[in-house]
């Protein structure tokens, strides 16, 4: 009889976990390193450039709504912010949950410590949107602790979402600015804080270089009028995105 009771308890325990907080986990998958290629249809290289170590993806049902919750574990809060800064788009609400976050019509994205989090609700219903804040709090503490350190030299204040990007390597730099990517082609760097003005095609870039040789090489490329400030391991510049030359199609 005791054995039967133990067996029943063992079988019931997963059900109790399943019912905890009202979240039904339909599927859970974990990916590490190059395993990310098996999950993403393109774009894995960008995440790997930022040093993602682990992705936990869950398809869940919460309050009758379907969600896909993805938690990417990054080396640092700055790396988490960097990948976040490249993926947010059309935010209806920003930095409202006690951390850096962006709510769009079908997705909530956030930076929580060294984690980049994406919660997609494909229905786009008002019910799904209303419950998404509660859902993310069940998995992560949205307390703003271990927030990314945005350099004060940039002069930016919260909300940070959409105001600045953190670029870790050639792939992310190319996605932000073609002219900056060309400037950094032969200058090793460790990270770039990028502030762009789409209307004027102007930008500012705080570039942290790998060594003094890279700093010297970069300084020689940049006009004095474009250098805002320079330190031992960084150079802060302003620039303008160059327009692509129009192809010559004759009279057509």
PLM segments and residue spans:
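Compositionally biased, low-complexity segments enriched in small residues
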Residues: 1-2, 149
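Sec-dependent signal peptide recognition
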Residues: 2-10
